[in-house]
Regions:
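Acidic, small-polar-rich N-terminal luminal/periplasmic segments of exported/outer-membrane proteins
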Residues: 62-63, 67, 76, 82-84, ...
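Outer-membrane beta-barrel translocator/receptor signature
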Residues: 224-225, 241-243, 254-333, 339-343, ...
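Acidic/polar loop-and-plug regions of large Gram-negative outer-membrane beta-barrel proteins
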Residues: 315-319, 332-404, 419-451, 495-520, ...
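Structural signature of Gram-negative outer-membrane beta-barrels, strongest in the C-terminal barrel
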Residues: 336-340, 451, 470-474, 478-482, ...
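Face-selective signature of the C-terminal outer-membrane beta-barrel domain
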Residues: 397-420, 443-556
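Membrane-embedded beta-barrel scaffold of Gram-negative outer-membrane proteins
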Residues: 402-406, 410-416, 420-426, 606-675, ...
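Gram-negative outer-membrane beta-barrel transporters
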Residues: 536-537, 658-740
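C-terminal beta-signal and adjacent terminal beta-strands/loops
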Residues: 731-740, 763-783
């Protein structure tokens, strides 16, 4: 059976990082229109203890998901009575500030403290303002920060990065805007510890800790694990519709059920805003790269109890690769309804297409010719025929209902319906080409299909008392079903082309009738529980577990897993207010892909493993700067590896066989993200890892053992305060892979040397509402 050049087959072009020059100049027009009247946002429940006023304001701003700007030293010695009950944002600030001599006033990006004028004292003036709680909420947009406030990817508990006993990397909205990160591939290239492997122009795979990442979440709802060979929009999603991207490292079986051991990617959508705001972006860059974006958000009723947001983006670009181009329209809408002071309903949807021309297939050129010699072509070489195109699309509708149950308990129901489809007419020069006379044969295939997925998740969370202390509990359950239907066509008739003068001219074959059919359905149900036990003021224990039922049916052999228990254990000990140490253990399993079969054509047992992690975490400046260091081990069973002894027989067997192997990943990583000084944002990370099989031989060597990623921006002061400058570097060590050379009848090592990539950016604030941004990517033109 033919598949669209499965990336785990015998031939493939190793690409572990982009090696091209890209220069993008973007002009952003941002307009934030103030409303004539103050919007009264629906009240929500708060329980903030009495204490220092600055601390209370930070906690309130975090829970209300708003910014508060003030000078910390001005509040020294002032106390707050605390806050308990249901309050609108303004009312909550008023209650906390009662008797302090200050009031909170609405500004464009949140709230600012203003001294109350009295007849006897005249006007009190604050010194220079300082953002203290902007980044501490559950959104990153508008905070200007490179670090998040809270995350819930690992356990459903809303925790700060320091309180989460696993490594988490978050690329915020500000980071994406500063460096022009417009799709998931771009974001992953900036994420510490992640390797991006591009199979061709439309298909990418991501790796973490030695494992492919096939766990995607959208607003915390797991999506069906994607089949990398049949990419259908996941990695090309436009970032215009997302607030941030969270990457939780290691196993995440507690919430995902079945999945991979490397990491989980959670894309968090933008939300409507309480005040009207909008922005338009126009961009132009190298190789006719043009982009436009419009984003409008705000209240839709006088009372503000209905809010909406609409986003549209369109990108039309060519490439350094010959003849390649891609058009990408994206539309997104979301609405929030305050059904009552205690109930919030959210509904939305998105519509995305990627429409390429001259899509490359299985790399951009064949590695070897018919003599087994390595090909040398110009960097812009594209192995695709002009008619080759891997079109992808995504259609999504979603809904969420949240209800305050009282006494700090909240119930939440999330529903998601998604269609990921592809329509691929593929033709490219592959294998051991060209022949000695310069001719080559074009490999062709047509693949069409879609995956229709439905997911539902329901949980309740809240505090409970035990042993004189307050603890947290989450109880939930989820159900999902996805049906993948696809057809494959191919024509094996010779289609000879001129390799040495290749311009993409080739005849499209007559596809005829479908020669392969896919009709597989995956169903998964699960129930989960998580608790955060407050054993002491400085010691927290997280316990959790999930019971999983997993079933695959269709025209491939069925598979069922019932009552599988997936545990989660984590502990955090606070050394002081800044530093904490942690340890965690997580578990996960993943049924094998249908092509992972042994010599007898039997499907391999599910891939499964355990993740151990120990580390140190810290937060500084009221959480505006986060740092972590971790050591991790992943012990894997039933890893699918090529059965080379069988596959390399003469004559070559008709089926390609895999065998099960054990593997262990060991490594460590450090990361820093956030504001290291006023106006100076940073995200930086270093990762080292080694993967060995049960014979102590290194595997997954196409992933670099070491990598560094660092991106930073600084807003200048004084007369240059309209200017922001920044830049970034990516470095990775050598990567290599043994690939079978058919003409030489043996394996040969293909490698990519260690390299640095350097990017620069600058932004100039022309007026209050107009800015211009320049991004220079790969300034030293590494290839």
């Amino acid at each position: 059976m033919h598949t669209p050049s499965d990336p785990r087959g015998r031939f493939g072009l190793l690409k572990s990082a982009p090696l091209s020059l890209a220069i993008l100049a973007a002009t952003t027009l941002s307009t934030h229109l103030a409303q004539a009247d103050t919007v009264n946002v629906a009240a929500q429940a708060y329980d903030i203890p009495a204490g220092p006023l600055g601390t209370s304001l930070n906690r309130f701003a975090q829970q209300a998901a708003v910014a508060i700007v003030f000078q910390p030293q001005a509040l020294e010695g002032l106390q707050s009575p605390g806050l308990k009950g249901n309050f609108a944002t303004q009312d909550g600030f008023d209650r906390l500030l009662q008797g302090s001599g200050y009031r909170a006033v609405k500004v464009n990006q949140g709230y600012a403290l203003q001294a109350i004028t009295t007849a006897s004292s005249g006007t009190m003036e604050l010194g220079p303002t300082e953002v203290t709680a902007t980044q501490l909420g559950n959104v990153t947009e508008g905070t200007g920060s490179y670090t998040p406030g809270t995350i819930a990817t690992s356990t459903r508990l809303i925790l700060t990065p320091k309180q989460t006993p696993q490594s988490v990397s978050v690329v915020t909205r500000q980071h994406m805007d500063d460096f022009g990160l417009n799709n998931v591939d771009d974001v992953m290239r900036h994420t510490p510890g992640i390797t991006v492997s591009a199979f061709d122009t439309e298909r990418s795979n991501y790796y973490a800790r030695g494992f492919s990442i096939n766990n995607f979440q959208y607003d915390g709802i797991p999506s069906t694990a994607r089949n990398v060979a049949y990419s259908a929009g996941n990695t090309l999603s436009d970032m215009a519709i997302y607030d941030r991207v969270e990457v939780l490292k290691g196993a995440t079986g507690l919430l995902t059920g079945a999945g991979s051991l490397g990491a989980t990617i959670n894309l968090v959508r933008k939300k409507p805003t309480a005040d009207f705001q909008g922005h338009a972006t126009l961009g132009a860059g190298s190789w006719d790269n043009y982009r436009s974006e419009l984003d409008v958000s705000g209240p839709m009723t006088d009372s503000g109890n209905v809010r909406g947001r609409a986003v549209a983006a369109y990108q039309d670009k060519r490439s350094f690769m010959d003849r390649y181009s891609r058009k990408s329209p994206t539309y997104y809408g979301i609405m929030e309804f305050d059904l009552s002071p205690d109930t919030l309903l959210t509904v939305g949807g998105d519509y995305q297409d990627t429409l390429p021309t001259a899509s490359s297939w299985s790399g951009s050129f064949p590695l070897i010719n018919s003599k087994g010699e390595r090909n040398s072509v110009k960097r812009s070489f594209n192995n695709a025929a002009n008619w080759s195109s891997w079109e992808q699309y995504t259609r999504t509708v979603f809904a969420m209902l949240e209800h305050d149950l009282g006494d700090g308990w909240v119930g939440k129901l999330q529903l998601d319906h998604k269609i990921n489809g592809y329509h691929a007419l593929m033709g490219s020069i592959q294998g051991d080409q060209p022949q000695p006379d310069g001719t080559a044969n074009l490999t062709s295939g047509k693949y069409t299909g879609d995956t229709v997925s439905d997911s539902a998740d329901l949980y309740v969370s809240g505090p409970f008392s035990l042993g004189g202390r307050e603890h947290e509990l989450v109880l939930g359950g989820s159900i999902s079903a996805s049906e993948w239907k696809g057809k494959g066509y191919w024509n094996l008739a010779p289609n000879t082309v001129d390799f040495n003068h290749w311009r993409g001219h080739a005849t499209m074959p007559d596809w005829g009738s479908a020669q392969s059919l896919i009709d597989d359905t995956v169903r998964q149900t699960g129930a989960y529980v998580t608790t955060r036990l407050n054993l002491a003021d400085d010691l927290k224990l997280l316990l959790g577990g999930r019971v999983v039922n997993y079933q695959v049916t269709g025209n491939n052999p069925s598979y069922r897993e019932s009552g599988r228990f997936v545990p989660y254990v984590g502990a955090i000990y606070d050394l002081n207010d800044t530093y904490s140490v942690y340890a965690s253990y997580t578990d996960i399993f993943m049924p094998q892909e249908n092509y992972n079969r042994d010599r007898e054509n039997k499907l391999l047992e599910p891939d499964e493993g355990q993740n151990w992690e120990f580390g140190l975490k810290a937060d500084f400046l009221d959480g505006r700067l986060n740092a972590s260091a971790a050591y991790f081990e992943i012990h894997e069973s039933n890893r699918a590896l090529s059965d080379d002894e069988y596959n390399n027989q003469t004559p070559i067997p008709s089926n390609y066989a895999y065998k099960s192997s054990k593997a262990v990943t060991k490594g460590y990583e450090v990361e820093v993200s956030g504001e290291i000084a006023p106006g100076w944002q940073l995200q930086a990370g270093y990762t080292h890892k080694v993967v060995r099989d049960d014979k102590d031989v290194k595997i997954s060597t196409f992933e670099p053992e070491d990598q560094v990623k660092l991106y930073t921006t600084y807003k200048l002061k004084g007369n240059l305060d309209k200017l922001t400058v920044g830049g970034g570097v990516r470095w990775q060590s050598v990567g290599w892979q043994d690939i079978y050379n058919n003409p030489h009848k043996g394996y040969e090592e293909f490698s990519q040397d260690a390299y640095w990539l350097v990017d620069l950016m600058t932004r100039y604030q022309v007026t209050k509402n107009v800015s211009a941004t320049l991004n220079l990517n790969n300034i030293f033109d590494k290839s």
